[in-house]
Amino acid sequence: MSKFQQILNSFSIKETLNPKVWENPDNPKKATMVPKVRKALERIAEEFVDYLGDNVFVEDVVLTGSLSNFNWSEFSDFDLHVIVDMDEYGDEDELYKELFNLKKQLFNTNHNIKIFGYDVELYAQDAEEPHISSGVYSIMNNGWINVPRKTNLEIDKKVLEDKIKNWTEKIDTAVENGDIKVLESIKDKLKKYRQSGLDDGGELSYENLVFKYLRRSGNIEKLFDSVNKGTDKELSVERKIED
């Protein structure tokens, strides 16, 4: 099986929640997190909060994404969100959002934490930001905020494949040409493309599935690396030293 087909097949809906993560995985309303997993996520969240700094107003710690839903696969990771009451920072809330976002990136880059082979990704989320995922589980309260629902939505893999190839070609061409403005434009368009899909169709929208494919295949990393290299080149100064 090709890598392309392997990733496409990973988008299929499973019959149960992931049994490594959940007790009673075949009944989402009664499903609870495996104690060993919950304890590990609690420890990781505590480490992340300490890294964010003093005076972090934590309201909850939640698991969201495919491992709290029926669309989990070998490519899944633990999306662990620390819910922060940003209103507590008053007029400095935007400053703290930027700070937490930067620290989130550094934390995830500098750590390689896995549970049962799945990566753990940390986020600091504003309490006012709505939960997009249909499956959201409170680690602190050990219960569902949003109970996951198995969907009967059929994914037209030919349509998805065409959309993926279109974006892959865009990225490959832009990376090959190395035009920083084009690269940044594609990066921004891709972000908006995914968000529009999440807003209109949720996690199983074609836009979000395209984004997931591009991330799992390494295309997004390639795009971001090219943007960074292009920026470095623009900011660098080359000077010929005359004898």
Question: What residue ranges belong to the model's regions?
Answer:
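Catalytic core of pol beta-like nucleotidyltransferases
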Residues: S10-S76, V84-D243
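Short linear clamp-binding motif
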Residues: M1-F11
